[in-house]
C-alpha cells in the first residue's frame, strides 16, 4: 500500500481500477468453485454459474470504461486491456455464455433446451442489474477521482451516429462474433480463446467509437440502464433487437442458405 501511495495520482487510479477488476475475477472464480461443489441440481447450478459469469463481465466492463477515460489520449491502452480481459473471461468463464444472444443461438441450433435457455437468460438479466448496484456501492467510496456515485446514475449515451447506422453496426458485430463462436468450436481451446479475444478487440476498435460495439443485451442493460429508462425504444432496438437479428441472420446463412446453395450446385453438377 505504501508503494502505491508513492506513485503519481494517475498511476494510482489506474492501479486501483485494475486491482478492482482482478478482485472481481478472483471473487467470481472462488464462487464458481463453491457452486460446483455445493450445487447439484442442474437448473440451480446453471443459474448460479451464468449469474456469476455475467456479473464478472459487467463489473469488469464498468471498470474498463473508467480506465479508458483515465488514459483517453492512448487508445491502444484501452484495446490492450480489452484483449487481456477478453482472454481472462474466456479462460475463467468456460461453460457460460454471459450473452443472451449466445443462449438464443444455442437454443435455435438445438444445443440447449428452451427451459434451460430461459433459466440462463433470467440469470443474465438479474446479474446485469445486480452488477450496477455493486459498482454503484464501490464507486460511492470514491477510491479514485473517476469513481463517483452520480456517474452510474446518469445516462451517458454511447451512440454517436444515427440510429440506422447504429442498428447495422450492432447487428454486424453480433453476426461476426457469433459466426466465429460457431466455427471456432473445433479449434484447440487455447488458440480459440486468443482468436476470439482478438476478434472482440477488433470489433471494439471498429465500432466502439460509434455504439460501443457491445453486441450483448445483458451488458448493454448493465452499462446503460438509465438510458433504457429515458430512451427505451432507441436502446431496445440498437442493443437488444439488432444483436438478436445479427444472430438470426448468421444462423439462417450458415445452417440453411449455404447448405441449400451447396445442395443445388451438387444437383446441377450431377445433371
Curated annotation (Swiss-Prot):
Keyword Endoplasmic reticulum: yes
GO molecular function: glycerol channel activity; hydrogen peroxide channel activity; water channel activity
Cytoplasmic topological domain residue ranges: 1-14, 63-76, 188-194, 256-271
InterPro entries cross-referenced by the UniProt entry: AQP11/12_channel, Aquaporin-like, Aquaporin_11, Aquaporin_11/12, MIP
Entry GO CC: cell surface; cytoplasm; cytoplasmic vesicle membrane; endoplasmic reticulum; endoplasmic reticulum membrane; plasma membrane
Impact noted for substituting residue 102 to V: Does not affect oligomerization formation
Post-translational modification: Not glycosylated.
Phenotype when changing residue 101 to A: Does not affect endoplasmic reticulum localization. Does not affect plama membrane localization. Reduces oligomerization. Impairs water permeability
Motif NPA: chain residues: 216-218
Transmembrane segments: 15-35, 42-62, 77-97, 167-187, 195-215, 235-255
Compartmental location: Endoplasmic reticulum membrane; Cytoplasmic vesicle membrane; Cell membrane
Motif (NPC): 99-101
UniProt keyword annotations, A-Z: Cell membrane, Cytoplasmic vesicle, Disulfide bond, Endoplasmic reticulum, Membrane, Repeat, Transmembrane, Transmembrane helix, Transport
Domain notes: The NPC motif is essential for oligomerization and water permeability function.
Function: Channel protein that facilitates the transport of water, glycerol and hydrogen peroxide across membrane of cell or organelles guaranteeing intracellular homeostasis in several organes like liver, kidney and brain. In situation of stress, participates in endoplasmic reticulum (ER) homeostasis by regulating redox homeostasis through the transport of hydrogen peroxide across the endoplasmic reticulum membrane thereby regulating the oxidative stress through the NADPH oxidase 2 pathway.
Protein name as annotated: Aquaporin-11
